[in-house]
Amino acid sequence: MGGGGHGGGITYKGVTVHTPKTWHTVTGKGLCAVMWFWILYRAKQDGPVVMGWRHPWDGHGDHGHGDHH
């Protein structure tokens, strides 16, 4: 199924898992970090709305339509 026997790897129950190249590891960790930063950023922005703590239209601060309180 796979390629030749080049490079190191770990064999378990007849299946050889080859070690990833360094750039694969670094790229994967970088993309993982970007993903978690994005998830946490969106959770900060949308969390109260998703949890039902406030409505999406509350607190936008735009009272320029003649609303005087």
Curated annotation (Swiss-Prot):
Entry annotated with the keyword Calcium? no
Q: Which GO terms describe its cellular component?
A: mitochondrial inner membrane; respiratory chain complex I
**Which protein, by its recorded name, is this?**
NADH dehydrogenase [ubiquinone] 1 beta subcomplex subunit 2
What are the protein's UniProt keywords? Answer: Electron transport, Membrane, Mitochondrion, Mitochondrion inner membrane, Respiratory chain, Transport
Where is the protein found, in the record's own terms? Mitochondrion inner membrane
Similarity comment text for this entry:
Belongs to the complex I NDUFB2 subunit family.
InterPro entries noted in UniProt: NDUFB2_plant/fungi
Task: Provide the membrane topology annotation.
Answer: Peripheral membrane protein
Q: What is its main location?
A: mitochondrion
Please describe what this protein does. Answer: Accessory subunit of the mitochondrial membrane respiratory chain NADH dehydrogenase (Complex I), that is believed not to be involved in catalysis. Complex I functions in the transfer of electrons from NADH to the respiratory chain. The immediate electron acceptor for the enzyme is believed to be ubiquinone.
Task: Note the subunit structure.
Answer: Complex I is composed of at least 49 different subunits.
Is Transport one of the keywords? yes
